[in-house]
Structures are given as structure tokens and as C-alpha cells.
Amino acid sequence: MSIQANLKEVLSELPTGVRLVAVSKFHPNEALEEAYAVGQRIFGESHVQEMTQKYETLPKDIEWHFIGHLQTNKVKYMAPYVAMIHAIDSYKLLVEVNKQASKVHRVIPCLLQIHIAQEETKFGFSFDECREMLDTGGWKDLKNVRLSGVMGMATNVDDDEQIKREFCSLNTFFKEIKQSYFSVS
């Protein structure tokens, strides 16, 4: 199935209001251009250098989302253009994103990465670490980042029930912190 046919099929199955982030890492520009031709405008990359090269050569109305583990020393390269960072896994990284976003007069939306998997190779805050970071309140002073939600990577297993439990725990945690730290009262 072609990229265009596959993308049209996936998009037809999405509920209204859901936006698709097409993972484009390791794919050549030609593949992204094919997806772009049928209307895909949001692409996800996990390597800063590859994302920057694609940003420089592809249409400027593309929204670039960073979806991989991010080192603090790489933030400065993407701060001028990244639309969202999906993997904030430490307060130190959040502070660095704020610093680099401030330099380019931007507010960068970010997702807190929560470690929900049974694998040590995955990154992210534990539930307790995230609560502690939010409790300290320092994040409220970071004016150039916007905490927009949470994300997690489930364990890489064939057990659908385990995967479901892990994502259910993430959903429960999201509802908890949304109520405790982000509710408008």
C-alpha cells in the first residue's frame, strides 16, 4: 500500500478533532512529501539533527514534533521551530527548554513523559517523581514552556492486557494531576 493510500485510510478512521502525528524518523524527504501531498502536516522525529535537516528543506507549514529522548544540549537547535516536545523526562530538561525558548521568544508546548513500562530502557518520571516536581511549583515560573499533557511508552510485549493496564494507569494519573495542578478554580 502506498504512503498516500495508507495515510488516507488511517485518517478516515480517526475521530473528529484527533490530529495524527506521522512518525517520519529515518524516512527520506520524498516519503514525507508524499504524505504532505495528501494533507499530512504534523511529523514526529526522534533525532534533532535529522529533524533540523528536514525542517530546513521541507515546506514551512509542517509542524515538527520531537518524540524521542532529548538531551539538554540539543534543545537549542530545535527551539526556533519545534511545535511540541513529547518527551520531557526531567525538571532539568524542562528548565533548559524554557531557557532556549525564551531566547527565541517562543512558548513551546511540552508533554511530561511518565515511565509506565516494565522496561528499564524506557525514560520518564515515575508517578511519584512527577508529583514531587509538580508539588515544588518551580514549573509555574517557566513562562516559555506550556505543560500540555502526559505521554508514556508501554512495555514492548504481546500481552494486550498488560499494555492496557499501563495506559490505564497513565490515564488515571493524568486525571489526578490535571485536577490537582491544572484545574481552573
Predicted regions, residues:
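Conserved alpha/beta-domain cores
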Residues: 1-185
